[in-house]
């Protein structure tokens, strides 16, 4: 064995989470040094780190659509469709979890009312959905997207629909054809495992770029809203989700919750993309020995509709806008906001800008003008380095938590 082979083998043997933490630490140090001192060498090294981060996220985003399509197609065409109950169960968990998260956001807004300084903020220039029907219409149109376009653009609702359709249609094909897709599935999985091994380098680049570009001074003016958002989402992750797990399985939920936060949430925090984190979640489900028929569908589905973090963000930011304008919603309006936030959050992945551009939709409930609402969206983009990171971590880790619950509930042997 050559020295390079020994080095690679030694790297692969080390704990992935430990390697990611080392990458985070080194990336933060490089970002701070480059921001403070600059210089040709440091700037060049930081630029190289940014390339590493972009390559990592790009690789995950590139492989995720192909992985989802092949896994679902091969799973449906080669195995018995015996877990329809599990799919219904996971969808129910996604809906209940997202609605409860919206309720948490509203509750925290009433407990810790927050106002925003919106006069000096330039309104975001993207177009937001006009009403909830627009969000739902966009989702339905994504389902009937061209399959090649769906894969190339990362439209996971379209990928899910076409993978299920092709899988059912090919269930009666020859064993030779089935073996081809099984082999493709295994090959794609190996590629994903290789990309995940490179996560420490990608995280190093992402952290370095984030610290260098943003620092802490920009966020200081919006510290209160950031704290309320983060604490509310942490409450969802550490109280609401464990409560759902305990009520469902009647056992200690925290080993599962902490495992999902550590192995899924940590990566999602830095990639800031539920779609890019799909391969990580599928790999974690495999490690947890969950039902493959279930998780091959529930994980990409969760990346599209399970948006607990987004529901928190939409409700808190909308109520912050209302508080800023002196609007005091009653209980009925707040409850309606929970419903709108939950439904809107389910469509967040179908909107460019995610949950932030659905804030005007929630603001319309209080008759807040769109130009004011878009200034709130702009604040969301300013604090996005924290808000979007925590939101994605909650969204993505919850996918695995609920998948594990459904898998254990419908198949106790897992």
From Swiss-Prot:
Q: Does the keyword Cell membrane apply?
A: yes
Q: Membrane-crossing residues?
A: 15-35, 56-76, 90-110, 150-170, 191-211, 225-245, 299-319, 339-359
Q: What subcellular compartments does it reside in?
A: Cell inner membrane
Lineage top rank: taxon: Bacteria
Q: Which SUPFAM superfamilies match?
A: Proton glutamate symport protein
Q: What is catalysed by this protein?
A: L-serine(in) + Na(+)(in) = L-serine(out) + Na(+)(out); L-threonine(in) + Na(+)(in) = L-threonine(out) + Na(+)(out)
Q: Identify a single GO molecular function assigned to this protein.
A: neutral L-amino acid:sodium symporter activity
InterPro entries in the record: Na-dicarboxylate_symporter, Na:dicarbo_symporter_sf, Ser_Thr_transp_SstT
Record membrane topology: Multi-pass membrane protein
What GO biological process, any one, is recorded here?
serine transport
Any Pfam family the entry gives: SDF
- Cellular component terms, GO, for this chain's entry? plasma membrane
- What does the UniProt keyword field contain? Amino-acid transport, Cell inner membrane, Cell membrane, Membrane, Symport, Transmembrane, Transmembrane helix, Transport
Q: Which NCBIfam families has this protein been placed in? A: PRK13628.1
- Function as written in the Swiss-Prot or TrEMBL entry: Involved in the import of serine and threonine into the cell, with the concomitant import of sodium (symport system).
The UniProt family comment states: Belongs to the dicarboxylate/amino acid:cation symporter (DAACS) (TC 2.A.23) family.
Q: What is this protein called?
A: Serine/threonine transporter SstT
Q: What is the lineage of its organism?
A: Bacteria, Pseudomonadati, Campylobacterota, Epsilonproteobacteria, Campylobacterales
- What would be the name of the gene that encodes this protein? sstT
